Amino acid sequence: MKNELICYKQMPVWTKDKLPQMFQEKHNTKVGTWGKLTVLKGKIKFYELTENGDVVAEHIFTPESHIPFVEPQAWHRVEALSDDLECTLGFYCKKEDYFSKKYNMTAIHGDVVDAAKIISPCKVLDLGCGQGRNSLYLSLLGYDVTSWDHNENSIAFLNETKEKENLNISTALYDINAANIQENYDFIVSTVVFMFLNRERVPSIIKNMQEHTNVGGYNLIVAAMSTDDVPCPLPFSFTFAENELKEYYKDWEFLEYNENMGELHKTDENGNRIKMKFATMLARKK
């Protein structure tokens, strides 16, 4: 698993005098963050601690040492042991956490992470990509990604980020209501987008998506619902009814289909994330 970690922040080289005080005191790494200490010169002492600050183990590291990753939330501190110390610290995470940790973006959608475990890198269209959280992740994994959104600022942010990360993502301003996909794709992704589309255009949009998915290709849709038992709490322009999305894809093979409660990142007046029902579907074209 350590092979899958990626560095999202590299600290400068520290000497004995520049070693930050916080690292010399009891502290821990964040959830989902691994620390990688590298000694370039001299010696440093590494203390493994309990939450109460009791020493569990001590290690002396030099440039020749094989230094393991500091696990997430592990309590520790360091101490310079030589005047000529030069060291640095890198912060690592899993690929699915990289963009949220580095750029403070919304987390990759969990269903995209799951889909990427079973769908090999291929030609992908991220329909309604927003700032590109899913697009950037899929591109990082080696997918050939095209990303469309109607929001200029979102596309500009994605373009800026892909340049910084040297990722090859094709972007465009696009109104999904136009239902005008013209190329074929192996995988079309649309997460938390349908609720902003025009109700009367949805049949054409889905038909257009299906027609431009290669045989054996996939559609992933996560979309808001409104049902008799759980009416949608927000005035979205479109919500799926019970089994409505399933009916559109009745001729496809379902790898996943559920209609479950979920949460938006948006919060109510009390600061709680808004709960509602979502249709989640990963289907393969026969």
UniProtKB/Swiss-Prot annotation:
CDD domains: AdoMet_MTases (cd02440). Gene3D superfamilies: Jelly Rolls, Vaccinia Virus protein VP39. The keyword Transferase applies. Disruption phenotype: Deletion of tehB leads to an increase in sensitivity both to tellurite and to the oxidizing agents cumene hydroperoxide, tert-butyl hydroperoxide and hydrogen peroxide. The tehB mutant additionally shows a significantly reduced ability to utilize free heme as well as several heme-containing moieties including heme-human serum albumin, hemoglobin and hemoglobin-haptoglobin, to support aerobic growth. Virulence of the mutant strain is reduced compared to the wild-type strain in the infant rat. It comes from the Bacteria. Keywords: Methyltransferase, S-adenosyl-L-methionine, Transferase, Virulence. One of its GO terms (cellular component) is cytoplasm. Induction: Transcription of tehB is independent of both tellurite exposure and oxidative stress. GO terms for molecular function: S-adenosylmethionine-dependent methyltransferase activity. The keyword Methyltransferase applies. Signal peptide: none annotated. S-adenosyl-L-methionine binds at G128, R133, D149, D175, I176, T191. GO terms for biological process: methylation; response to tellurium ion. Probable S-adenosyl-L-methionine-dependent methyltransferase. Plays a role in both resistance to oxidative damage and heme uptake/utilization, and is important for virulence of this organism in an animal model of invasive disease. Also protects H.influenzae from tellurite exposure in vitro; however, since H.influenzae grows only in humans, it is unlikely to encounter tellurite in its natural environment, and it is thus probable that tellurite resistance does not represent a biologically relevant role of TehB. Belongs to the TehB family. This is Probable S-adenosyl-L-methionine-dependent methyltransferase TehB. It comes from Haemophilus influenzae (strain 10810). The gene is tehB.
